[in-house]
Each structure stands twice: as structure tokens, then as C-alpha cells.
Amino acid sequence: TLVFQPSKEILEQNFKKLCSYGILDCSIYSASFNSKEISRITFATIGSVKNHPELFTHFKNIIVDECHLVNPKEGMYKDFFDAVKCKVLGLTATPYRLSSSRDFGSMLKFITRTKPHVFSEVIYVNPIRYGLLGEAGLLFNESFRVE
């Protein structure tokens, strides 16, 4: 599995987190880390792999963190996905895109409703429901308890 991260910092954080679970068959392919290792699970930034899709055609799956940043019409991600031809799973906490039309002006569209689209279906949505205002003035969602 190839795992795309939007930045060097998030790549490092997620790589270390996976390793902390005892999964050691993972590597980093990123110019920012001076590391170009490919293993069963490879963490990468699109900028580091965009010119070398042939190295990743054996992967069956790609996971894209912050997938709302993927341009479905053109760009590095689209070119890479077209070249490697495997399943792509996108993860995001922002499943909407701002789009505009001459008739309706600016509007938010769910990521699977844009045309053309990279992501064709939504597997799971966890809506945030805001609850109580905590003592620190922070707004907690219902998964946190204010004591």
C-alpha cells in the first residue's frame, strides 16, 4: 500500500505512529527525508513520486490523506493515479469542495459530486455534532466528555 501525505511533517508523524504499533514493514519514499525506500507499506509525498510511477505499479492500493486537496481535473495526483491504475482510498475531515457556477455562484459540493471525480463513493461519514462549551471556552464534539 502506498500512503500519500500532504506534507513532510504529517508523513513523519503518521509513519512513526504506524511503527509504534509494531508494524515494521514500512518505509518512506520522500526527497525531504533523503529516503527512497519502497516496502509493503510506503509513505510518500506526491512531489517525490510523481515522476516515477513505474516504481509503484506493483501496489494494489493507494491511501491519500487530506484527499480534498486532490484536483480531479489535472495535476500530479491525477497523472500518477492514471499511470499506476490501482484502487485509491481518500481520507479527509473536509469532504467538501468550494465550487462556483455562473448560474448559482459559490457553493459547497460533496467531494464525490464534483465532475470529473477521483473518488466515486463515500464509505463512511462521521458528522461532527457540537455539544457543550467547556470551561476553557473550547467547543467539544459529543465524543468528548466535559467534567
Predicted regions: what they are:
Residues Q13, L18-E54:
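Inter-Walker segment of RecA-like/P-loop motor cores
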Residues S7, A44-S48, L91-P95:
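A short beta-strand-to-loop transition that corresponds to the Sensor-1 phosphate-sensing loop
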Residues K60, H68-L139:
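Post-DEXD/H (motif II) to motif III coupling segment of the RecA-like Helicase ATP-binding lobe
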Residues D65:
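Walker B catalytic carboxylates
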Residues T1-S20, R97:
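Conserved Walker A/P-loop ATP-binding site and its immediately adjacent core
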Residues E147:
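Conserved interdomain hinge at the start of the Helicase C-terminal
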Residues V3, T42-A44, I62:
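Hydrophobic positions in the central parallel beta-sheet of the AAA+
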